[in-house]
Amino acid sequence: ARMNEDVEVVHYAITAMVELSKEYDYRLQKIEKKYTNDPDDPVVLEEYCDFLKEYLSQGFMEKQMEQIYRNQYTQLLLKQLDQKVNLHICVCLMENLMVQRDFFLAEKILKIMDQNWHRGEEYWIWKIRYLAERKMGKELKQSLQALKEEHIYLSSRGKEALGFWLDGSKK
């Protein structure tokens, strides 16, 4: 909308974005206060993580602020993971860590996923994405081979997510 030549369209689009941004800032202040008052409440922690995931996905923040909140999100997810090992938390961590390019921590999360959900498609999707992102061709090829040999079930979503690599490994 910012690139639109119609001044009125641009004005309404910017006004809407500013309002939405204000709303997120207000909600952020509320949840931060709630968390500060009760940092050990798992419900508040989950609410804070869910909010940050939503807020970060909107793309409203400047790069520096986004980095600060991504770091905060990682720390909160790790705290959740300390309370309870959970696949959803691991997936959220992998999503965030890959954006941050924190491969050291991503590898640790992959190990947790491997120990707990080795036959699950989420583990394999993230392992292959991780190896591809790191340009670890040999390990990627080995993982694709293991995926086939171990007869890991992939849903249509999993096949779509790994389609590029699966198609390439058939040749």
List each language-model region with its residue ranges.
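Alpha-helical repeat scaffolds
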Residues: 1-2, 24-38, 62-81, 103-114, ...
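Generic helix N-cap/helix-start motif at coil->alpha-helix transitions
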Residues: 4-13, 24-27, 39-49, 55, ...
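Structural motif corresponding to the intra-repeat A-B loop/turn of tetratricopeptide repeats
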Residues: 20-21, 55, 100, 134
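Generic L/I/V-rich hydrophobic alpha-helical segments across diverse proteins
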Residues: 76, 90, 109, 125, ...
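Extended alpha-helical scaffolding segments
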Residues: 120-122, 126-132, 137
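C-terminal non-catalytic interaction modules
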Residues: 145-171
